[in-house]
Amino acid sequence: MLMVIDIGNTNVVVGLFAGHELRARWRLATARDRMPDEWWVQLNVLSQSAGFSLGEVVGIAISSVVPSLTATFQELAQRYLLVEPLIVNGAQDYGLPVRVEHPAEVGADRICNAIAAVERYGAPVIVVDFGTGTTFDVIDADGAYIGGAIAPGITIAFEALTQRAARLYTVALQAPPRAIGRNTRESLQSGTVLGYAELVRGLIRRIRSELGHEAPAIATGGLATLIAPLVPEFSAVEADLTLYGLRSAYERMHRSLGA
């Protein structure tokens, strides 16, 4: 089996693949101070509860935006599974041309999303990943990654507002019944949720205009289910797009090495 690990600022998502099939997945809180031994114990418990043994894992692919945890999981792979993990980054060749000024600066999760999106939907295609930050990734008609946009995630944007405005308070992040709020709660939900949906719609329209194509837009990430229903420009929601991209990156790298 192949273990794929997507390390984000808020969550660590772990998946187990048997061939092309995602057999199990877990979303865990990003705990930067947790040791390799602690992660190993937790993953063992989760895998056993799902009917799997980590002894079946023969390879690991990691996407990470948290350098300290990259090292933690690399040590876990080496010590407990006796494998050298693939650490995805924008400077490596996965068969996806990366045509930006500094390829090494492109987040590994964005590379994985692009790989999986092209495999599933062809090119051109746009991927919007809703996480701690919201990223827009653009693949042109030639199948090349050409950049995108990064916006504050809806959760941290909302937290910044309520923390800095003395008379505002936290409310449930959900779409209100109308844009014109009749009270503070509805007004906050309108400005935050509906306003964020319009941010996404507007950027998708601008990106399509610059591309010169009505490229399909795919939503992914932990908060996709909140915003995607409010954005008719989306063609699909793919909750595990990054995990599938990690699997593909691993397979492509091993094919190129003749493994």
Swiss-Prot record:
Source organism superkingdom: Bacteria
One cellular component (GO) term of this entry: cytoplasm
Example of a GO biological process term: coenzyme A biosynthetic process
EC nos: 2.7.1.33
Cofactor: NH4(+); K(+)
Keyword Protein transport: no
Cofactor note: A monovalent cation. Ammonium or potassium.
Cysteines joined through disulfide linkages: none
Transmembrane segments: none
Cellular localization per UniProt: Cytoplasm
Keywords per UniProt: ATP-binding, Coenzyme A biosynthesis, Cytoplasm, Kinase, Metal-binding, Nucleotide-binding, Potassium, Transferase
Keyword ATP-binding: yes
Catalytic residue positions: D109 (proton acceptor)
Chief location: cytoplasm
Record function comment: Catalyzes the phosphorylation of pantothenate (Pan), the first step in CoA biosynthesis.
Quaternary structure (record): Homodimer.
Family label: Belongs to the type III pantothenate kinase family.
Protein name: Type III pantothenate kinase
